[in-house]
Amino acid sequence: MQLMTKKLANVVETLIAPSDKIRKILEGYQVSCPVEVIPSGIHLEKYQLCKKEDWRKKIRMQLGISQDALVLVYVGRMAKEKNIEELLEYQQDAGKSGVILVLVGDGPYLPELKKKVEELKLAKNVIFTGMITPEEVGRYYQAGDLFVSASISETQGMTYAEALAGGIPLLCRRDGCLEQVVTDGENGWQYDKKEDYLMRIQEWKGMGENARGRMQNKAAISAEKF
């Protein structure tokens, strides 16, 4: 891969990377041309509209979740490299205070994750939605107060941008692809260990309605760079 990239760089004027993480990787290959970062675009309106239409209430009713519950939502492929097991392990502590984790999507690792939920006795505060249609994706983000991810395998992570566009702040494991995405305390947080993760959840719980609204607005504004 490195050799092919270097050869390609010799015949082009510029390489385009979707994130700063990939730019650094390419520059580590010692390519001969400049590397510019241009994020893959998304249709912001699709996710903004779901917020305006108040899908939060509708999806929560559909999933049997209280409107007052603190909900963490993950949207994406259920695959081992997404490190979803970490979210389940952390949910053992987060769930003690009534926090609900909603895992949206399907994938080859789903049976293992369901088995993990049984082993950890988390059935009361972890919900699997299974596969949903593309039209429903933006609606399911709205079920959450915070979008969570433990993945460190992303090149850009379009779900981060989608969540932000819907006004959902992020709580994600620290990763290079998030350097230009998350501003701690503004549109979400990055975490390094379980204690950080749980602390941020408690911080959100302790916020007033106005403070939460400001972070949600900043999340939506920050998505415009995509």
What are these regions (language model features)?
Residues 1-15:
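Membrane-proximal helix-turn-helix segments that form the acceptor-binding/catalytic region
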Residues 131-132, 139-144:
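Short alpha-helical donor nucleotide-sugar binding micro-motif in glycosyltransferases
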Residues 195, 210-226:
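A charged, aromatic-enriched C-terminal amphipathic alpha-helix characteristic of glycosyltransferases
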